[in-house]
């Protein structure tokens, strides 16, 4: 195969750590020269020839030789080096390699390519990993070729290497993690509070109890606070396994700098400006809000000079040199400044807005509560049938023809309304909204119920008032405010449950379990890991700056210190299998099973943009997974007997989602069908579900009047100055009720970042490396998947251009539903499905 003294030519591609800091004075070459000499060594490991211990033979230490400037495929910041390995026939075929970094600075290893291997052609190693000084590791760093093997089919000389690498990633569960560590482990959410700083910043531990169940997050090993041994102390940097912290990516860079800047610099700067009365503390008219995009907001010179030098903030804010900050105009007002106020748009956003996955079919009237009457008394709805305008239908007819729907936040908010209303500047209701499906296929709201806990105590039942649609007089202002209370409930549920809990937090246990138990050689590892990209990192950043005590979420959203605790209450009823789109639609009563339809379900709202478009994406993902899995598993027994796979799923359920481990709905992972279902749901959550609830945040919520995050006062009573204000100045009354100016500026700053695609985003149907596997059949199936997504995008464009679908697809604001278009350019595009929860 190889003659004695044969050499294998290789190319190593890497990124120096300081690539982005390099000056344009030629020092880049000097930095690259540092990799030459005896700075970085590699040793090939045989996949076919074993030593006396049964392990693949290891070749000689070989060092990088020279800079390769002619490689055409290099990306930005990447550098290529030549290397020649001594290798002969007695060593067999290389299947892995060791690498040692003798420098003091780490680098990002992209790949190794071996050329002209006899009978093998090119062998590729896709690495994508930070490599630190070798003394920092307990075992030598190893990388495997891009072949795919279930455990039982691993070449015998590689078996122990495969097992040892997984063991090193699991760690031993002790000690504080360091920056260079690669260890994946679990912990509860016990680091959101900071009781050492103030008892007001203490927060309950989420996870590990029936009171506050929660998914697990990555373990950092930081010690406890002095005040509370159950709370983990804060740190300057929150550890994530090193390869989860994608420091070489623009998306990660933008997110980290942006959110930290907002929480640590911009928020205090805004606060100082308001304290100094240098900018008005309230919006006085709707035009004041529109001025954020048209004229900008004037801030003191020192505030501007504090903010603008920050790299991401420079992009975030537009300044004309006159101490004016401007936000981009949200999509929802780009055609009309007032269409957001219509009942049609209020209803449409429940099926085509940023939170389109909560509305339910109403199957009985009046609506009932599931709250325990022994604790909360009578929580039944006070809405009466004869008060509703059902376009000539009786209540029985409307129910029988499945034309009634409900946005129901009553049971979720009622247990917290009393505590929330005791907070400073927070006043709200638990809401129910009844909607009627008209003959033209659009929804109209017919009643809103606003409920408060009784002043005599919870057992005395709810105090409710029903508000009906009105077009004129003070009643129209009351109706507008009632819709605002609904949207405040919806905004909070969206951010904390639909977005944070159901995508970000629910995904992290699967990320951890995958790296602990599935080798990089495993077919399911190769299938799923693109959908984990940056998830742990953004979640750690959220714990540090967004969902932490007195962080951006608590500062800008109604529930304040109860925000994340409320998501724990919702997690009690989280069901993994219900995250599947068809199951979700059926459970919510907005679809019924129908085998005669392309996707097996029939929508009760015929053009429900999120559901209709989502089912197309769901079906494409399902086909891809159904074609990929049988390439490696021929029978159910193959799934049962895959030791890595079984350990992965057992731990994901029993540790990662341990508070729900005894629920009967978990798939048992005993069949091919189980495996397809599990992978399909994970990919759906990470890609399309997250895209649907994330990238519309600024397009819809950038207009705070359309998506208020808080309410500050209840409906005024007759005879009060506030009631007179409703009569005489409905704009001022509305603005005094919803989110005030300072939290609006902070909120808009955050959601603009969160709604923006980075230039290096990787979208569904794409991979960041075309050589992610050597399996040609898998590559062909993946190409087919990508082509199908392009077809779907064309289909969705046609739907949005269909005159018969304009009511739900464009609505009064004339904003087409594009959130589930698979592709996107960079920027604030209101479209695009990234592979993962990367922002």
UniProtKB/Swiss-Prot annotation:
Impact noted for substituting residue 495 to A: Reduces catalytic activity
Listed result of changing residue 494 to Q: 37% of wild-type activity
InterPro entries linked: LipOase, LipOase_C, LipOase_C_sf, LipOase_CS, LipOase_Fe_BS, LipOase_plant, Lipoxy_PLAT/LH2, Lipoxygenase_dom_3
Binding-site residues for Fe cation, renumbered to this chain: 499, 504, 690, 694, 839
Reactions catalysed, as given in the entry: (9Z,12Z)-octadecadienoate + O2 = (13S)-hydroperoxy-(9Z,11E)-octadecadienoate; (9Z,12Z,15Z)-octadecatrienoate + O2 = (13S)-hydroperoxy-(9Z,11E,15Z)-octadecatrienoate; (4Z,7Z,10Z,13Z,16Z,19Z)-docosahexaenoate + O2 = (17S)-hydroperoxy-(4Z,7Z,10Z,13Z,15E,19Z)-docosahexaenoate; (4Z,7Z,10Z,13Z,16Z)-docosapentaenoate + O2 = (17S)-hydroperoxy-(4Z,7Z,10Z,13Z,15E)-docosapentaenoate
Domain of life: Eukaryota
Pathway: Lipid metabolism; oxylipin biosynthesis
pH-activity dependence text: Inactive below pH 6.0.
Location within or outside the cell: Cytoplasm
Family statement drawn from the similarity comment of this UniProt entry: Belongs to the lipoxygenase family.
Protein name: Seed linoleate 13S-lipoxygenase-1
Organism per entry: Glycine max (Soybean)
Upper classification of the organism: Eukaryota, Viridiplantae, Streptophyta, Embryophyta, Tracheophyta
């Amino acid at each position: 195969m190889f003659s004695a003294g044969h050499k294998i030519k290789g190319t190593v591609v890497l990124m120096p750590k300081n690539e982005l800091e390099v000056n344009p004075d030629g020092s880049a070459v000097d930095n690259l020269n540092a990799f030459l000499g005896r700075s970085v060594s590699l040793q090939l490991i045989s996949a076919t020839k074993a030593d006396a211990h049964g392990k693949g033979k290891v070749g000689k230490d070989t060092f990088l030789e020279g800079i390769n400037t002619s490689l055409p495929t290099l990306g930005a910041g990447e550098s290529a080096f030549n290397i020649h390995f001594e290798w002969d026939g007695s060593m067999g075929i290389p299947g892995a390699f060791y690498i040692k970094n003798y420098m003091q600075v780490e680098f990002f290893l992209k790949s190794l390519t071996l050329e002209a291997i006899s009978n093998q052609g090119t062998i590729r190693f896709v690495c994508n990993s930070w490599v630190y000084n070798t003394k920092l590791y307990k075992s030598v760093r190893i990388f495997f070729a891009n072949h795919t093997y279930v455990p039982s089919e691993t070449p015998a000389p590689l078996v122990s290497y495969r097992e040892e690498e997984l063991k090193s990633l699991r760690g031993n569960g002790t000690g504080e993690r360091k920056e260079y560590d690669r260890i994946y482990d679990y912990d509860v959410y016990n680091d959101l509070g900071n009781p050492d700083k103030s008892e007001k910043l203490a927060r309950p531990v989420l996870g590990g109890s029936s009171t506050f169940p929660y998914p697990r997050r990555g373990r950092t090993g930081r010690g406890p606070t002095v005040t509370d041994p159950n709370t983990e102390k804060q740190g300057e940097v929150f550890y994530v396994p090193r390869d989860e912290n994608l420091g070489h990516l623009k998306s990660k860079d933008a997110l980290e700098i942006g959110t930290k800047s907002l929480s640590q610099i911009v928020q205090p700067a805004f606060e100082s400006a308001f304290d100094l009365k240098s900018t008005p503390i309230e919006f006085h008219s709707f035009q004041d809000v529109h001025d954020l995009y048209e004229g900008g907001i004037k801030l003191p010179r020192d505030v501007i000079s504090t903010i603008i030098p920050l790299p991401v903030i420079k992009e975030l804010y537009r300044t004309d040199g006159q101490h004016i900050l401007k936000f981009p105009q949200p999509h929802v007002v780009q055609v009309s400044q007032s269409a957001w106020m219509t009942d049609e748009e209020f209803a449409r956003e429940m099926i085509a807005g940023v939170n389109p996955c909560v509305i339910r079919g109403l199957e009985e009237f009046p609506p009932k509560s599931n709250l325990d009457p022994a604790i909360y008394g009578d929580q039944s709805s006070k809405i009466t049938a004869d008060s509703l305008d059902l376009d000539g239908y009786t209540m029985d007819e409307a129910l029988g023809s499945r034309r009634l729907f409900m946005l129901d936040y009553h049971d979720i908010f009622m247990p917290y309304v009393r505590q929330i209303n005791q907070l400073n500047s927070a006043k709200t209701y638990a809401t129910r909204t009844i909607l009627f499906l008209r003959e033209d296929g659009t929804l109209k709201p017919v009643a809103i119920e606003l409920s408060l806990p009784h002043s005599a105590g919870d057992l005395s039942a709810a105090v409710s008032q029903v508000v009906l649609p009105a077009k004129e007089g003070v009643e129209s202002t009351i109706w507008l405010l009632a819709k605002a209370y609904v949207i405040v409930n919806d905004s909070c549920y969206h951010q904390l449950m639909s977005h944070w809990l159901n995508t970000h937090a629910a995904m992290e246990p699967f990320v951890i379990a995958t790296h602990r138990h599935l080798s990089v050689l495993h077919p399911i590892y190769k299938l799923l890991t693109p959908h984990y990209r940056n998830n742990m990192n953004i979640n750690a950043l959220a714990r540090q700056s967004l969902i932490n005590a007195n962080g951006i979420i608590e500062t800008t959203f109604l529930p304040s210190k109860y925000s994340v605790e409320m998501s724990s209450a919702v997690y009690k009823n989280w069901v993994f299998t219900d995250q599947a789109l068809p199951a979700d639609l059926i459970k919510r009563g907005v679809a019924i099973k129908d085998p005669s339809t392309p996707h097996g379900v029939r929508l009760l709202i015929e053009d429900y943009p999120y559901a209709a478009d989502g089912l197309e994406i769901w079906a494409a993902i399902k086909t891809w997974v159904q074609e990929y899995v049988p390439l490696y598993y021929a029978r159910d027994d193959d799934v049962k007997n895959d030791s890595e796979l079984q350990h992965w799923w057992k731990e994901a359920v029993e540790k990662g989602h341990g508070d729900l481990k005894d629920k009967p709905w978990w798939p048992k992972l005993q069949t091919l069908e189980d495996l397809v279902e599990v992978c399909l749901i994970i990919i759906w959550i990470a890609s399309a579900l997250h895209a649907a609830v994330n990238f519309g945040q600024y397009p819809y919520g950038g207009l705070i009047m359309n998506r208020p995050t808080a309410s500050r006062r209840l409906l005024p009573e007759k005879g009060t100055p506030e009631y007179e204000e409703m009569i005489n100045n409905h704009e001022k009354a509305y603005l005094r009720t919803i989110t005030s100016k300072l939290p609006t500026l902070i909120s808009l700053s955050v959601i603009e970042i969160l709604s923006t695609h980075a230039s290096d985003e990787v979208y569904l149907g794409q991979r960041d490396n075309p050589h992610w596997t050597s399996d040609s059949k898998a590559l062909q199936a993946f190409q087919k998947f990508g082509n199908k997504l392009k077809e779907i995008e064309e289909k969705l464009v046609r739907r949005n251009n269909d005159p018969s679908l304009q009511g739900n697809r464009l609505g009064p604001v004339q904003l087409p539903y594009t959130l589930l278009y698979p592709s996107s350019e960079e920027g604030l595009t209101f479209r695009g499905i990234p592979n993962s929860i990367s922002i």
